[in-house]
Amino acid sequence: MAKPSAVDQPDGAGLRERKTKTVEEPVKPSATSGDGGAAQTKKKTIGRTPDGTAFTVPHTRDMVSQLLSPSEPKNLSDILVLSIIGLHIVLLYLLPSYFRIPIFAVLFLSWRAAYNIGIGWLLHMQSNHSTMVLWARQTKIFVNPATGKNPHPKLYSFIKRELETKIPEDYSFEDAPIEYNTWLVFRRVVDLILMCDFTSYCLFAIACGSRPAEENFLVLILRWIVGMGLVLFNLWVKLDAHRVVKDFAWYWGDFFYLVDQELTFDGVFEMAPHPMYSVGYAGYYGISLMAASYKVLFISILAHAAQFAFLVLVENPHIEKTYNAPPPRKRVLESHAAAVTANGEEKFSRRSSDSSDMAPPPSPVALPSSTHNLVGVKNLDLHRITDSSVILIQLLFFALTMLTPATPIYQFFFVLNAAVWRLWYSVGIGYILNCQSHRREWTRHFVKFGETKEEAWNQWKGTYHLSMTLCYASFIAAAWKMYTLPENWGYGLAILKHVLGAGLIALQIWTSVSIYESLGEFGWFFGDFFFDEAPKLTYSGIYRFLNNPERVLGLAGVWGAALITSSRAMIFLALLSHTLGIAFIQLVERPHMQKLYGRGLRQDAGLVRSIKRSLPPSFKQLHGSVDRILDESIEFIEEVLDTARPKLAAGVTTFVKDTSELFHKYPARITITRIEPDVAGYDMNDYSLSVDTADCITIKDGAEDKSEVPVFEYGSPIKISWTAPLNHSKKDWVGLYMIGQNPSREVTKVSSWGRWVATNEGSFDSVLSEKGLLTSDTVVSKPDSANASANNSKKSGKSRKKSSAHEVASGQMVFSGDKLWWTQGVFEFRYHHNGKHNVMATSRPFEIRIPKFDDEHIPSHLPPNGGGFMTTAVEQALLPIVQNCFDRDPEISPQTAEEPFGCETESDLKYAKRVVYAVHQMFGIEFATEVVRADGNVQNLAWRHAQVKRREHTYSRSRAMK
């Protein structure tokens, strides 16, 4: 069934599915947007560059049409692409048969690497640093040579002719934004790589193609029919996807600019997540089937896996950053006003683990805290009895499986054990949930003994998690016992069975991960059976396409194991698992969802809607009749079970102890040293670095600090000034390092890990290098010194005229945010020459310190409800530090103790980690990052600190009285 959540957030599940980005900045129209009048402009697609420049996006043709259609104008780049494709085809016929397979395997893998690694790197750099646009600006290839600023006039004319030939309407090379022209050039590179990638793959399949000797004619026909069907389906997916997303998303246009239009996603984007990368590769397996070659199959799987890696590492991060940005933070008054709806109902998440919607710790909570999750390796906590029990049980199953022989009697008991645990996991757990749904039996049991419903919820999570582990551990153990290695891998379908089985197992793992990502911890453990506050449905993630993904895809792995083992016993277990899984959905989950959400339930998911639209009316009527018969049968079974259900008493009592161990990891010292061989032409005395000490703090923790090292507050921006000779390199840069990292004062041998700023704009291929740059190359006067003149005369052989001062270049920059070391210590700045690691100047050392909180001014004996003294004091001390942890950004940094943190706390753990470290150093209390995210503001953190201190004080008094 569809799963409920607090917010119906769009998923961005389809490949290159782009939502419209609203831009509120003033529009700076370019020359291309004014042609044709306002009426005509409305009919055209309007693009918008990152700086707000609007322009008309010309109509472009798809890759295949512009290359192969005779009606499309051709240019030199088209001829180049077609020539390279032709060379591939000629090479196939010229090579000897024994060379064809390895040569074309290498060719295809090379083009695939150019696609996934080459294009992936370019897009990653463009997304994060605008690298390709910076290259275009630095080389000035799009600047009109008539201005005298373009050093490559012939290249300019060539690119202009190439692009204007392909886009005859609504396009002017001189007037188009640099982002759009850069994208057009990038498109031509993509055309070459993609066409050669596909061509080399097809030629590799032809080289490997053969007919098995034992294959009969019927199997041959069936193999080609299925293979052609997959290829045609692949072709339809590509064409339909291009119809929806057009060239803009097909060629990753939003890495360069955005379009102002409503984007609709239907057709193939309703059928599967990331259709271009998932079902869009079905043709690979169709070609493998027609070629009847395992070589083609394995290279297809490798290419498909590389494409998914491209999606995860390149596409998804950009989509999240561009289209799924956190909503604007609500201020205190807005949050209070929106906390209650018009009907007086509080708005809480239903089946979502989003902790930002939780009530603060001091006030009553409607939903359980998600600060200590249970599912996943990253949440493993061996101090928790559930986790330690799960690990011990899995070790026990492993030992029993490995140490016992695979005799029929042991195989029988392993299969029986797996069947019993599957029955418990479906029938037993289903019975508990059904009782909880109708009579709240599980919760009432704990309330009867004075526990809260949160304790009942925690105990239920442990029970369900342990049951699920036992179910699948026993199934895996049974599969291992029933499995035997094939005697001859080349005989029959042994390899194919293992490949398909592994694919089905991977499909179940992916489905489970997708379900957990959509539902969160709350939905994974059926939280709406235990909490009733303001349910709201969500159809994000995998639920956008399927109502019950666990019904089929969620059990694909058990059939994969049955296929690999080829055992009747495993087929029985797979059939039992699937039958019980469907029964659990129909008899337990579906009735509860209907009772809770009623008509709010969606009838058909995206995939079902797409299939129904393609069915004739007669099939639709038959489908409705079958649904009615199934519903009546299920109602009858429910009535029988209700009358015959025995009373089941279930209770589990455990003591939960929450601790965490955090290890502060310092970056590894990687020596990547680049040295400029000749720096003799520069006056070393003209280089200097000075730290602005206006923001230094006075430590009030009682420690004597007799050193003259300036001290800065943790996370506060640090402003520095530099000077250099007028002829200094434009690629100079300043890095921030911890004292002791670099033993040499002449050369830096440790990476700065991104903590550096360029002295001049446009010198490096990254916009991040200029972040923090305030001024550069301001000419100032610097006093001469006798020593400096003497040293300079010895080095350069020249003498400077005697004067009281001479001119040098100067600049200012500020280090803040990710360019700071988020730890305590003593640091220094280093000025480096010409993009290398030669040190030209070093700043005065300075210290980053977090002042210790002084508990002496807090009353030692606080009444039970009198923690306000400590809470207020902690709030005042903590607020400035927390503001620094959030980079003093008004969008996410709290201005008061009551104001909530920005939504970036949820998506980026770095802010929470900074706060955790600061609290630990300031108060001696170590919280988990989940606690910071759940508390949501300084007031709640201060309240939590007061509670911990009160417990410590109570514990100390009880120890003293003994």
UniProtKB/Swiss-Prot annotation:
Bias kind Basic and acidic residues: ranges: 14-27, 344-354
Pfam families from the entry? PEMT (PF04191)
Region described as Disordered: spans on this chain: 1-55, 341-370, 780-808
Q: Which cysteines are joined by disulfide bonds?
A: none
Protein's job: Catalyzes the first step of the methylation pathway of phosphatidylcholine biosynthesis, the SAM-dependent methylation of phosphatidylethanolamine (PE) to phosphatidylmonomethylethanolamine (PMME).
Query: Record's PANTHER family?
Result: PHOSPHATIDYLETHANOLAMINE N-METHYLTRANSFERASE (PTHR32138:SF0)
The name under which this protein is listed is Phosphatidylethanolamine N-methyltransferase
The uppermost taxa in this organism's lineage are: Eukaryota, Fungi, Dikarya, Ascomycota, Pezizomycotina
Gene name of the encoded protein: CHO2
